[in-house]
C-alpha cells in the first residue's frame, strides 16, 4: 500500500505544523481538551514521519486516563492497534526492564553489582582494565557499540553465544572515566545475572519483575513475527510500505530484545517512578 493511500484512509484532511501548535497548551484545563490536542499531535506525527501505528497509554496516580491505538498493526489486513495486546519491539526500553531485574537480584543477594564481571563471567576475554557489573549497567565500562550491520543479525544466538559478537574487541577507555551508551553493556549484565542465579535470564525477569507487576504481555523476541505483534514496516523509494527484513534479537535480550505493549511499558514506568517495587 502506498503511504499516500494509507494516510488518506486514516485522515480526511492533512494537518500542518502551524495548525498543530497554534494553541497555547498551558491554557488547556480539561482532560478532554488535552486528549484532543494530543491527538492532533499524534496524527501529525503519523503523517509527517510515515508511521504505520502508534499505541498510547497514559496514567495518572496509577490509573489509566487515556489509552488509544492509532493506525494499523497490519496495514494490508487493517488490524487495529490494541494498547494492551498489540506487541511492539521495545528496543532499548528493554534496558530499564533489565535494570529493575538487576536491582531486584541485588536486593535478594544473588549478585553484587560492585563485583567484577569476571566474578560471574570468567570466560569473557580479559581486557586491559577490570570493570564491574555496576559500571556496565551505567555505560561506564568502555564496551563498544554496534558495528556495521550487527543490529540486523538474523540468527538465533543464546545470550552467552551473543557476547562473541564483540568479546574480542578492546575497551574504548578506562572504565569509570567516560560514559558511552551502548547495548552490549547489557548483554554482559544479563549474562552476569544468568550466571549468578544459575537460571536463564528471561526466567528470572518473568518471575521476579513481569509477573509481580502484571506485565503479562511482555516477552522475549525470538525472531519472526509473534502472535499479536505489529508488523515492522519500512518505506521504499516509491513511498510504499513494506515489511522489514527479519531479525533475531534474543542474543541482546537485556539491552534491546523484548516485545511489549503500551500498557505493560506503562506499568513498568509506574514501578520506576513509584520507587515502591
Identify what each model region corresponds to.
Residues 77, 85, 97, 103-122, ...:
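Short, well-structured active-site flanking segments
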Residues 74, 128-277:
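Short, surface-exposed loop or secondary-structure junction motifs
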Residues 15-27:
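Acidic/histidine-rich, surface-exposed loop or edge segments in extracytoplasmic proteins
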Residues 34, 82, 90, 125, ...:
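Residue-level marker of regulatory loop/turn positions in helix-turn-helix DNA-binding domains and
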Residues 36, 42, 56, 62, ...:
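Active-site SXXK
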Residues 1-14:
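Bacterial Sec-dependent N-terminal signal peptides
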Residues 29-88, 112-115:
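Short, conserved catalytic-motif segment at the N-terminal edge
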Residues 25-30, 256:
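Short, low-complexity N-terminal intrinsically disordered segments enriched in polar/charged residues
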Amino acid at each position: 500500500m502506498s503511504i499516500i493511500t494509507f494516510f488518506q484512509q486514516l485522515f480526511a484532511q492533512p494537518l500542518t505544523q502551524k495548525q498543530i501548535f497554534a494553541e497555547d497548551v498551558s491554557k488547556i484545563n480539561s482532560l478532554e481538551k488535552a486528549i484532543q490536542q494530543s491527538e492532533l499531535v499524534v496524527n501529525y506525527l503519523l503523517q509527517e514521519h510515515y508511521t504505520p501505528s502508534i499505541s498510547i497509554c497514559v496514567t495518572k496516580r496509577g490509573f489509566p486516563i487515556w489509552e488509544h491505538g492509532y493506525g494499523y498493526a497490519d496495514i494490508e489486513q487493517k488490524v487495529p492497534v490494541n494498547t494492551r495486546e498489540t506487541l511492539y519491539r521495545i528496543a532499548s526500553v528493554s534496558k530499564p526492564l533489565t535494570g529493575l531485574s538487576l536491582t531486584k537480584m541485588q536486593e535478594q543477594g544473588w549478585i553484587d553489582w560492585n563485583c567484577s564481571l569476571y566474578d560471574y563471567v570468567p570466560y569473557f576475554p580479559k581486557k586491559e582494565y577490570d570493570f564491574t557489573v555496576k559500571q556496565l549497567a551505567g555505560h561506564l565500562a568502555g564496551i563498544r557499540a554496534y558495528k556495521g550491520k550487527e543490529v540486523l543479525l538474523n540468527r538465533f544466538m543464546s545470550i552467552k553465544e551473543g557476547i562473541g559478537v564483540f568479546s574480542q574487541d578492546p575497551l574504548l577507555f578506562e572504565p569509570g572515566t567516560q560514559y558511552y551508551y551502548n547495548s552490549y553493556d547489557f548483554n554482559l549484565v544479563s549474562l552476569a545475572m544468568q550466571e549468578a542465579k544459575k537460571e536463564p535470564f528471561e526466567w528470572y525477569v518473568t518471575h521476579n519483575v513481569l509477573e509481580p507487576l502484571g506485565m503479562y504481555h511482555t516477552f522475549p523476541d525470538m525472531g519472526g513475527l509473534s502472535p499479536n505483534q505489529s508488523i515492522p514496516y519500512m518505506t521504499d523509494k516509491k513511498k510504499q510500505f513494506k515489511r522489514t527484513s527479519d531479525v533475531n534479537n534474543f542474543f541482546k535480550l537485556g539491552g534491546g530484545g523484548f516485545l511489549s505493549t503500551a500498557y505493560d511499558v506503562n506499568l513498568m514506568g509506574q514501578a520506576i517512578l513509584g520507587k515502591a517495587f
